[in-house]
Amino acid sequence: MIRRLLIAWMLPATVTAQAPVVDYHQHLFSPAASALVTGKPESPGINAKTLVALLDSAGIQRALVLSVAYTWGKASRAPVDNEYEHVKAENDWTAQQVAQYPDRLRAFCSFNPLKPYALDELARCSRDSALRYGLKLHFGNSDVDLDNPENVAQVRRVFEAANGYRMAIVVHLRTSIDNKRKYGADQARVFLDQILPGAPDVPVQIAHLAGSGGFDATIDAALGVFTDAIARQDPRMKNVWFDACVIVRPGMAAEQLQTVATRIRQIGVARVLYGSDAAVSPASYPKAGWAQFRRLPLSEAEFRQVAGNVAPYVR
């Protein structure tokens, strides 16, 4: 433990000052989850040792690891036998992995919030010393329809329960592309008006700047709902953070990059977090992700602010 702490404290002195302190959007995959997602039974997955090595190569001290247990309940996939047992196993495996590097990694549990077991699993995670810090919800993977009042009410219940457990929430807000769910300003307002107020006392991190990676007019319309709320000092936004995970894509036009930079300034760089997503290929490794993010027309002071931001749930 002492050796790991010393390494973590020494890292900033041995790498560029521009390296982020924390990667706020990472995933580990158990061999079982990797086989499920890739369709390859021999898939080894991504473990904590691999991730920490990638963080070291990027000069990044820590990472927020978002469990992918929700993928066992993916709405567009055929049902899995003993689904809830797989969800628990994936959350537990993630907890075991991060426990190997307690000074470097922090885990959030996950599940499909529309499933009958959702509140039971949240309660179970709240009692786990490695998972009690927070919850990851993926509206796209779970096919949360923000135009469906029953879906909205159920997700609100999950938010209220997480607030009661004092668990932070990371939410992939973009609805299902596979199922062609509507998404834009109207759906973002539903989240702001009907779901977010269920968790007034805990931090909420909106992933991918309210998108799913990249940046287009649809994402911009949704994000605009939140930047407008920030501009009018809406109290519902006081604990909201945004990760800019895989926003900048190769070949992105200068005009798009400028739009993203403008939105980041409207959000406020003090609440924008760096994230690189699952390290499934060299192009998505933390170091490569930061290099892509650096293409944005932000000032060096703004990059330093984003790199140094430390959200409450990783302190």
Regions from the language model: what does each represent?
Residues 21-24, 65-66, 108-109, 136, ...:
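Active-site neighborhood of phospho(di)ester-bond hydrolases with catalytic His/Asp-centered motifs
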Residues 17-24, 28, 32-62, 266-273, ...:
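Mid-to-C-terminal alpha-helical segments outside catalytic/metal-binding sites
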Residues 4-13:
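Sec-dependent N-terminal signal peptides
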Residues 38-39, 44, 49-77, 104-112, ...:
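Divalent metal-dependent hydrolysis catalytic cores, especially in the metallo-beta-lactamase
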Residues 45-54, 116-126, 259:
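Short, acidic/polar
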Residues 132-134, 147-273:
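Catalytic pocket-lining loop regions of alpha/beta-barrel enzymes
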Residues 77-183, 246:
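Active-site gating/metal-coordination segments in enzymes
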Residues 40-46, 71-73, 83-87, 112-119, ...:
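Acidic-and-aromatic substrate-binding clefts and catalytic sites of carbohydrate-active enzymes
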